[in-house]
């Protein structure tokens, strides 16, 4: 009966997942496999003939990659601009060192070219690479070599990623917190203080004439004239002895002091008719609109003092493009704030709702894009493939944010759930597929081909660590993402993802993966045609 159940793919799938989680929770000297343990259980089941359908694996793969891209999209382009050149250079070193290792060992052990390109594709777990290897060599030896190198290509990257922080004695959680503080430093913390108008050059001049926001970056949120407190407009006139309250970074507040007058600590109390509220942007029509275009002061008599996005307070400049889920701190009279709330949406439930149409449409577009075949010449062509197509489309859609009524984003809990589900399906299928031929390939081909494949897997990662840490001084979270992306290893990314509560590895992975995929395909084609 149990044997019959094992032939049921859905029973085997959930049994593999359950046993994988049990194994993943076992810690030895503080090291555990976490979700990566699923693939080891799957390898064992695959050896005994259990099969998970390929379609389930592909379904899981597109879910996992799409959720990675949707989350990483906005950070991807920022990362590409700030440190993209360094990460791409390390990625090129990974691909080059893998191919040079393979070619060197080919001549050392007299291995045929089809087997070498198959070993490269397997060691870097690249199915598009295998397709190119078979197409370029017209030999079944490429797929056999791929099967030999693939299991260690999966397991080796997972173990390397798990062990690297221990070997380097780096606490990933502490490193993530340090990088978060560093990131926040790029967006200075906003403060509030009051000023007494003592600079004669601003007496009897309006805020529009003074142009304080453009000159200092600070936002003037309240004014006290005589004993009356109000929310200033562009036409509000300053008088000697007035008090104003402003919000901004320490630098902008200091600059405002030079412009206005004496700086004092404290806050001006709100008038009884005024309130301050935190409002959520959840209305589709408002996404990507600039804050200044809303004319909140003119239309509602309200002022935005700060915008909170992804845990960071942003200065509410007029050209700030609003994003879904932004939290705006608004000051104004009660009725005015109600009007702003209606304009923005302010519906917390919408943040947790999951709209499956953007997910389905995004994956469809990604799969179609992956089918494109870009020809550079009669002998050289490139196709993004399933993984590359879905990832690149998800990155672009996430960065765009909104197309007409469609919002290309997901709530955090929904993203994590779909990502974990996709990953488990993918690992279970990949593991059983690799496990069924594991022993047979060892018996037929011996340890030589396996050893060469293992070297092609390990050497590039060592090169990346040495160059990345010693030459470029890259933090370990970016390095883990770059290694897994450069090795085109989705299971490796999953291992890194499970070790730390940060999306830094995912952003680095998304930054370099498309580059790695293109270079790997080009190198395999060159080796297939030029190396004998």
From Swiss-Prot:
Protein name in the entry: Uncharacterized transporter BT_0500
Regarding protein family, the annotation reads: Belongs to the AAE transporter (TC 2.A.81) family.
Query: Known Pfam families for this protein?
Result: Asp-Al_Ex, TrkA_C
Q: Which organism is it from?
A: Bacteroides thetaiotaomicron (strain ATCC 29148 / DSM 2079 / JCM 5827 / CCUG 10774 / NCTC 10582 / VPI-5482 / E50)
> What Gene3D superfamilies is this protein classified in?
Regulator of K+ conductance, C-terminal domain
What positions does the domain RCK C-terminal occupy? 179-262, 263-346
Presence of keyword Transport: yes
Q: Which GO terms describe its biological process?
A: potassium ion transport
Q: Which GO terms describe its cellular component?
A: plasma membrane
Q: What domain of life is recorded for the organism?
A: Bacteria
Lineage per the UniProt record = Bacteria, Pseudomonadati, Bacteroidota, Bacteroidia, Bacteroidales
Compartments, record wording: Cell membrane
Q: Which UniProt keywords apply?
A: Cell membrane, Membrane, Repeat, Transmembrane, Transmembrane helix, Transport
What are this entry's molecular-function GO terms? monoatomic cation transmembrane transporter activity
Q: How does it sit in the membrane?
A: Multi-pass membrane protein
The stretch of residues making up the signal peptide is none
């Amino acid at each position: 009966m149990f044997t019959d159940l094992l032939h049921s793919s859905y029973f085997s799938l959930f049994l593999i997942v359950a046993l994988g989680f049990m194994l993943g929770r076992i810690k030895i000297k503080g090291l555990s496999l976490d979700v990566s343990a699923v693939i080891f259980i799957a390898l064992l089941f695959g050896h005994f003939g259990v099969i998970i359908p390929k379609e389930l694996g592909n379904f899981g793969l597109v879910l996992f990659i799409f959720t990675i891209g949707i989350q990483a999209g906005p950070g991807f382009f920022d990362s590409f601009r700030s440190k993209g050149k360094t990460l791409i250079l390390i990625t090129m070193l990974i691909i080059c060192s893998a191919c040079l290792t393979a070619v060197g060992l080919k001549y050392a052990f007299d291995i045929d070219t089809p087997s070498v390109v198959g070993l490269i594709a397997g060691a870097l777990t690249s199915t598009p690479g295998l397709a190119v290897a078979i197409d370029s060599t017209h030999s079944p030896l490429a797929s056999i070599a791929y099967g030999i190198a693939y299991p260690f290509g999966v397991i080796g990257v997972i173990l390397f990623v798990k062990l690297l922080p221990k070997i380097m004695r780096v606490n990933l959680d502490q490193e993530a917190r340090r990088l978060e503080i560093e990131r926040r430093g790029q967006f200075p913390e906003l403060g509030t203080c009051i000023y007494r108008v003592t600079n004669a050059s601003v007496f009897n001049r309006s805020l529009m004439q003074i142009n304080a926001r453009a000159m200092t970056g600070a936002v003037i949120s309240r004014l006290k004239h005589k004993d009356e407190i109000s929310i200033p407009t562009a036409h509000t006139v300053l008088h000697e002895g007035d008090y104003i309250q402003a919000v901004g970074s320490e630098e902008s507040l200091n600059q405002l002091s030079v412009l206005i007058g004496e700086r004092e600590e404290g806050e001006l109390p709100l008038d009884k008719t005024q309130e301050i509220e935190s409002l959520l942007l959840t209305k589709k029509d408002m996404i990507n609109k600039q804050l200044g275009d809303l004319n909140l002061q003119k239309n509602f008599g309200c002022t935005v003092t700060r915008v909170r996005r992804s845990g960071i307070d942003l200065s509410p400049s007029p050209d700030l493009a609003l994003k879904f889920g932004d939290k705006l701190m608004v000051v104004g009279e009660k009725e005015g704030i109600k009007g702003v709330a209606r304009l923005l949406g302010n519906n917390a439930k919408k943040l947790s709702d999951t709209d499956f149409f953007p997910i389905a449409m995004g994956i469809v577009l990604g799969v179609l894009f992956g089918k494109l075949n870009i020809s550079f010449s009669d002998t050289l062509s490139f196709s993004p493939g399933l993984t590359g197509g879905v990832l690149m489309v998800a990155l672009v859609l996430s960065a765009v944010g909104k197309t007409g009524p469609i919002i290309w984003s997901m709530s955090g809990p929904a993203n994590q759930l779909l990502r974990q589900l996709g990953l488990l399906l993918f690992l279970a299928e990949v593991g059983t597929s690799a496990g069924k031929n594991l022993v047979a390939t060892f018996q037929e081909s011996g340890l030589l081909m396996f050893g060469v494949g293992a070297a092609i897997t390990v050497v590039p990662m060592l090169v990346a660590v040495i160059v990345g840490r010693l030459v470029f001084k890259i933090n370990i979270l970016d390095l883990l993402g770059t290694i897994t992306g450069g090795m085109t290893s989705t299971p490796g990314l999953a291992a890194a993802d499970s070790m730390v509560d940060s999306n830094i590895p995912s952003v680095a992975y998304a930054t370099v993966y498309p580059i790695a995929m293109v270079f790997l395909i080009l190198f395999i084609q060159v080796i297939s045609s030029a190396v004998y």
